[in-house]
Amino acid sequence: MTTQTLLIELLTEELPPKALNNLGNHFAAAVAEGLEKAQLVDGAAEFTAYASPRRLAVQVKNVKAVQADQKIVKKGPAVANAVKDGAPTKALEGFARGAGAKIEDLTIVHDGKQDVYAYEYVQTGKPLGGLLEDIINAAVKKLPIPKVMRWGSSTFTFVRPVHGLIVLHGGDIVNVSVLGLQSSNQTLGHRFLSNGEITIENADSYAAQMREQGKVVASFAERKAAIQTALEGQARRLNATVAADEALLDEVTALVEYPVVLEAGFEEHFLAVPQECLILTMQQNQKYFPLLDQNGKLMNRFLLVSNLQTEDPSHIIRGNERVLRARLSDAEFFYKQDQKATLESRLPKLANVVYHNKIGSQAERIERLQSIAAHIAKALDADAAAAERAARLAKADLVTEMVGEFPELQGTMGKYYARLDGETEEIAEAIEQHYQPRFAGDKLPESKIAAAVALADKLETLVGIWGIGLIPTGDKDPYALRRAALGILRMLMQYGLDVNELIQTAFDSFPKGLLNEKTPSETADFMQARLAVLLQNDYPQDIVAAVLAKQPRRLDDLTAKLQAVAAFKQLPEAAALAAANKRVQNLLKKADAELGEVNESLLQQDEEKALFAAAQGLQPKIAAAVAEGNFQTALSELASVKPQVDAFFDGVMVMAEDAAVKQNRLNLLNRLAEQMNAVADIALLGE
């Protein structure tokens, strides 16, 4: 059967730029899936997604014009039960009637268990046109659109009004109706660069015709690559690098159909404003691409992506420069205004900034942060006074003009204003870095002072918000407590502090009775659960569970322990020792009395005497290795007692009739368990 390329295009009004690529990919994948289910393609569909500001399209290779005929076998009652006294039973008659057949048309087949009556027939394949309308409608309904709209007098809904529909199989129009539109082979190109309607001659010529006749680069990926290449080329010419992230590049790609990269500039005096402010306003407000010199300093040149190609782009450049000048003038004004007051003088205003109505204002919060940060700094052997000062000023920039306009700059502006106020560089940097890490993979604070304030900030948030009952549930975490917990854990894995003690310190900083009394224990459990999630990104679940079963309160040696357990797991003796450890733990649960020291005089059998001697020799070796942080050595020592452990369980009845002997053997196993689990609960390995 011959096949041809299928093309579907929805011509729309301007689609949401941040969602465009996702919409295009979902639409294409859903159409391809529908074609596969309808058996209009053989195997997995080979498709290309297209998405530009005014269109979603998909091109699918090797689509059949008609489904293949299918042999259908409907199975009915068992032969043994279908005929009675030479006449068909009601079950057989009902099956034939339901199948639309006569009894004499039925055949007998084997269903794998027994012979059954069946009706076999050939189902004629349906034409593409009879199936495609439902496939497209289903694909439209599957799109991830949080809010839809209606347009004109239409009752149909979509993310934006739809004005055109192309459905081509090869060069033939497939007659379907979707969203109130009849399919055709005509579309529109670029709003300003194309000349009216474009007739797509063939499904395979879509991309080329759109580019040549419509001045539209229909492929999102192709536009993005073209923009990136042009940006990098322009930057190299200027001996600069582009300050841009993937999100900005994606958004700009979604805003243009025929991208042209242009160079523009602004007055040098604006560079006196902190470059973070200028970069943010260029990227966020104007969707421009700032340029950095070889030292990472902002240049007074930038790149913009125009949706127009002209012989003389100077008017486009001047227009964009004029708009940016107004934006940068605002930033310059805010910066100058903010310098009229010190951070210290702004602190009283924080009393009017509500943190949460149940736990007070930012001013009250600052008092808590100061005490927590000073405590942590002492524990880190850092300057407690500097940490307290940094914590005092950490939130003062929240009431500045610049942060009011650009909340993303909180902390960053605090750093600049602290420098202008004569604060030390260490305090200024701590003010900025106390928000770190902001997200997974973000860098940690660089100094102990900054780490103390950052830990204080996140601990106070976690304990305070949790303590008033605003606990994360499902996908709801409005106060980002999970993120705060992960930030705390990442810092504590660098600094050797007791996590439970820090939680208690944060809890004690709140007025007595304000928070739920169970908050310290509940947040400690929450942190343990988040720690497991964090570690499972890099280590198998059983290794993480084994290490965390010891409920470590200091996290700076966690990585070493995890690596040691991973190495131990590879030893030939590991599986048997893990199983033995599990058996030991199960036996210890049956102890009637409190476990204590081993009484050598009650050791009766050679196997238990040998195990006692081995455990005695093992204890100082493991203790020394653990004390030195050499956890791999500690675990590898366990391999030496495997023969004695095996012999003990093969030859000794632990739960002896003599109560004293039984207790002594349990004491021996308890001593062994302490050594086996000095680093991790190895019984959990392999589970």
Curated annotation (Swiss-Prot):
GO terms for cellular component: cytosol. Its EC number is 6.1.1.14. GO terms for molecular function: arginine-tRNA ligase activity; ATP binding; glycine-tRNA ligase activity. It catalyses: tRNA(Gly) + glycine + ATP = glycyl-tRNA(Gly) + AMP + diphosphate. Keywords: Aminoacyl-tRNA synthetase, ATP-binding, Cytoplasm, Ligase, Nucleotide-binding, Protein biosynthesis. It is found in: Cytoplasm. Pfam families: DALR_1, tRNA_synt_2f. InterPro entries: DALR_anticod-bd, Gly-tRNA-synth_bsu, Gly-tRNA-synth_heterodimer. One of its GO terms (biological process) is glycyl-tRNA aminoacylation. Belongs to the class-II aminoacyl-tRNA synthetase family. Tetramer of two alpha and two beta subunits. This is Glycine--tRNA ligase beta subunit. It comes from Neisseria meningitidis serogroup C / serotype 2a (strain ATCC 700532 / DSM 15464 / FAM18). The gene is glyS.
